Design a protein with these regions (language model features):
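Solvent-exposed loop/turn segments at secondary-structure junctions
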Residues: 27-30, 54-58, 85, 91-98, ...
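Mature extracellular/periplasmic domains of secretome proteins
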Residues: 73-79, 141-145, 171-174
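Extracellular protease catalytic domains of secreted zymogens
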Residues: 156, 164-193
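Loop/turn elements at helix/coil->beta-strand transitions in domains of secreted/extracellular proteins
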Residues: 45-48, 81-86, 114-118, 150-154, ...
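Flexible, low-complexity junctional segments that flank or bridge functional domains
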Residues: 1-86, 94, 100, 110
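Extracytoplasmic/secreted envelope proteins and their assembly/folding machinery
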Residues: 68-75, 89, 101-105, 154, ...
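Gly/Ser/Thr-rich loop/hinge elements
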Residues: 95-153
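Sec-exported extracytoplasmic/periplasmic mature domains
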Residues: 76-80, 106-113, 162, 174-178
Length: 193
């Protein structure tokens, strides 16, 4: 409909739309954090490449661990392909759950790291009385589905959106193996959830 208003002696006509629209709810997408994985062969080097975008074990509202299982399947495939190097692309990974991070690291680390200290969860003074501290260890081979790659080193691609559990990967594997970081400075949010 048209409305007439007066401003400064001029007539101004405005078109006003008063139509409401109903739309059905959009379908929920299940987007796996494993964006892509591939094998690159260069002479004797068999390089696994993985773009991993979030440390989630399953989609919101689910309790089936399907994303962790997909991650294990990728590493089982890497193991079948006998990769001897890994490029882990975390440029767009803002973090996620520490347990999923621990799973990923347990599949990357040298076998000698399995069962060793992965991280120690310490809480602030207010919560320390309630929770104390928890020592988390790299998972044993049986808990990673036989998918430990026993790698000698890791290459991690980083960017300004690399944060939290992504930084935990870098910092917590370094005591056990060389981790080569390629890219820009990470966000600097080295905390877990």
């Amino acid at each position: 409909r048209m409305e007439k208003t007066m401003q400064g002696g001029f007539e101004i006509y405005q078109t006003v739309y008063e139509k409401s629209v109903s739309m059905d709810a959009a379908e929920t997408l299940d987007v796996s954090p494993v964006l892509t994985d591939t094998l690159i062969v260069r002479g004797s080097r068999r390089i696994g490449y993985l773009v991993y975008n979030e440390f989630l074990s399953e989609p919101a509202g689910a309790s089936d661990g399907r994303y962790d299982e997909q991650l294990k399947a990728v590493f089982a495939d890497f193991k079948r392909q006998h990769i001897n190097e890994l490029v882990l692309d975390l440029r767009y990974n803002g973090g996620g759950y520490v347990n999923t991070c621990r799973l990923l690291c347990s599949m990357i680390a040298p076998q000698s790291a399995l069962g060793q200290v992965f991280c120690i969860e310490r809480f602030n003074d207010d919560l320390h009385a309630l929770y104390g501290e928890t020592v988390l260890r790299f998972l044993p081979e049986g808990e990673v589905g036989g998918c430990n790659l026993n790698l000698a080193r890791l290459y991690v691609l980083t960017g300004p959106w690399t944060a939290s559990s992504s930084e935990l990967v870098i910092n917590n594997l370094r005591p056990y193996m060389p981790v080569k970081v390629v890219g820009t400075t990470t966000e600097g949010k080295n905390v877990g959830s």
